[in-house]
């Protein structure tokens, strides 16, 4: 039996952890995840999905604010694990920890060396990529630069957003890890170095990147909206206030960038630099998200063709 420390935070990670827990070949000694955080409009203190799953299986849980130099690090190393598996953990692993185990592998949600960093799925959708994937890789000190053990891909559909792709890639990553790990540990599967000259990066998105640029072609704005849903959510301005847009559809029509070019009781069409978008799920400032029909029957009733979003 291989003794493991698992490190991860969101539901993506919990899906991978669940797969390991169902395999008798692996003994999960402990789980390391991010601290509980205030979440949502009510700022409720919330456990990470990985912590919830770990507690359900009565596993020890460590939640260091910063792993390096912490007492938790010493306690984790004292467990004597054979290896570490990480998936969207959200922190760098200290070299001393990597050196203390026989192996350390990561389930990364991109086709490396493309999209190293913390937001690979967001960037894949925003950039209009036709496919996304996962890579099982060895952990090294440099971010997502380790040798690749295996990879798998799937298509990105127009109906996909970050949330749906996270769910799909979590399952893909779980299955790939469980398929790959035995051959890797036996030495039958040899890792392959990345071509570092081809590396691209996907750093966490800034607040400025959440704002839509209506001067871009409609397809790019459409991709941007999907690449921000369900978090951090793309927005524009409506009467000077933040107006979040969760979902939209490509539409025909033209006009000045951000201009409302059609309005009915059920639709609101906005021009982009080329083409247009019909908004379908929105969130006005201070309100919950709502279908466009509800918005147009309420506070959006006063909008008129010719009004401009983004100002």
Curated annotation (Swiss-Prot):
Catalytic activity: L-methionyl-tRNA(fMet) + (6R)-10-formyltetrahydrofolate = N-formyl-L-methionyl-tRNA(fMet) + (6S)-5,6,7,8-tetrahydrofolate + H(+)
Binding site for (6S)-5,6,7,8-tetrahydrofolate: 110-113
One GO molecular-function entry: methionyl-tRNA formyltransferase activity
Keywords: Protein biosynthesis, Transferase
GO annotations of cellular component type: cytosol
NCBIfam families cross-referenced by the UniProt entry: fmt
Biological role: Attaches a formyl group to the free amino group of methionyl-tRNA(fMet). The formyl group appears to play a dual role in the initiator identity of N-formylmethionyl-tRNA by promoting its recognition by IF2 and preventing the misappropriation of this tRNA by the elongation apparatus.
Protein name according to UniProt: Methionyl-tRNA formyltransferase
Organism: Streptococcus equi subsp. equi (strain 4047)
Lineage, opening ranks: Bacteria, Bacillati, Bacillota, Bacilli, Lactobacillales
